[in-house]
């Protein structure tokens, strides 16, 4: 494994932790404003933060922005794909059950691996396929809290189908990011995607933005929004752009398997108690899957 690949894995490990934190904060502020307003604001905050960072960073030169002039439509495409995930998520979650949507989310690594082959011809080895399979099973086991009764209420309705389409967009973003990178530094491409994505989200959620009483929102709202904007948007977008250039698509999104695990550990740290002991079986499967994916191989494809 090369140093770049090791940094790619480290980036996605941090990514999975930060995304887990976004679920914790997201639950606490979800009912305080329209989802479209919250996500529009997080894009704007993230873009401003990265813009300031690039402005004061002596290592970012004017010449680094030159590749953006080459086929600028790439960023309209990439931003539209990523924002589409949020739009379909908003619509789908209006009627989709929480458990059902969580299960669909755990399928993103498999979707990403398949789309990585279609778009980039990234080979899916037997080891990778096996790791993705047991990782999905482990993540679902955690989502269902090792309770068969939760599995029995799983239902695929209109909301679930809409959310599934959104997850396909999410999965496609990784291989498309690599395909349409023309030499930009990850921080530059992240900034461009956030700017264009922020405009698209603002157009989609302008009614929600205008409806929020920004000056009188509680402290927890601003704490959660700043976390989402800084850590779950600016930092995670950069991490995923960096990892997409260092690792195969399936390996990048496989770190989503760890997100339910981190959510549990964060909840325990907050004093919300441990889940049933049987849930640990799912955690073990997720860890095994990631260990299998750490091995770099180019042997017989599936």
PLM regions and their residue ranges:
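Transmembrane alpha-helices of multi-pass small-molecule transport proteins
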Residues: 32-84, 111-112, 169-176, 190-209, ...
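Specific transmembrane alpha-helical segments of multi-pass solute transporters/efflux pumps
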Residues: 18-23, 57-101, 105, 141, ...
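Helix-helix packing/entry segments at the starts of transmembrane helices
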Residues: 39-41, 99-107, 176-199, 230-269
């Amino acid at each position: 494994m090369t140093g770049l690949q090791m940094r790619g894995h480290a980036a996605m490990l941090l990514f999975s932790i930060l995304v887990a934190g976004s679920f914790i904060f997201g639950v606490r502020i979800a009912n305080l404003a329209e989802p479209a307003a919250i996500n529009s604001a997080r894009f704007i905050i993230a873009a401003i933060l990265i813009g300031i960072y690039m402005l004061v960073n002596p290592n970012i030169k004017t010449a680094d922005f030159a590749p953006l002039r080459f086929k600028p439509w790439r960023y309209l495409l990439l931003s539209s794909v990523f924002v589409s995930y949020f739009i379909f998520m908003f619509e789908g979650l209006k009627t989709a059950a929480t458990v059902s949507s969580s299960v669909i989310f755990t399928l993103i690594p498999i979707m990403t691996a398949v789309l990585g082959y279609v778009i980039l011809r990234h080979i899916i080895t037997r080891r990778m396929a096996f790791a993705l399979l047991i990782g999905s099973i482990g993540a679902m086991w955690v989502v269902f809290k090792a309770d068969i009764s939760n599995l029995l209420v799983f239902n695929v309705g209109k909301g679930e189908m809409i959310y599934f389409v959104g997850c396909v967009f999410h999965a496609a973003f990784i291989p498309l990011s690599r395909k349409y990178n023309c030499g930009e530094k990850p921080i530059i491409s992240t900034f461009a995607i956030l700017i264009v994505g922020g405009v698209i989200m603002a157009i989609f959620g302008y009614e929600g933005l205008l409806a929020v009483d920004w000056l009188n929102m509680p402290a927890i709202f601003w704490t959660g929004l700043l976390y989402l904007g800084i850590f779950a948007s600016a930092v995670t977008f950069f991490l995923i752009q960096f990892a997409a250039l260092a690792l195969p698509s399936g390996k990048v999104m496989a770190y989503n398997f760890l997100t339910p695990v981190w959510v549990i550990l964060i909840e325990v740290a907050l004093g919300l108690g441990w889940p049933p002991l049987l849930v640990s079986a799912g955690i073990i499967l997720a860890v095994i899957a990631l260990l299998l994916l750490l091995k770099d191989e180019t042997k017989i494809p599936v």
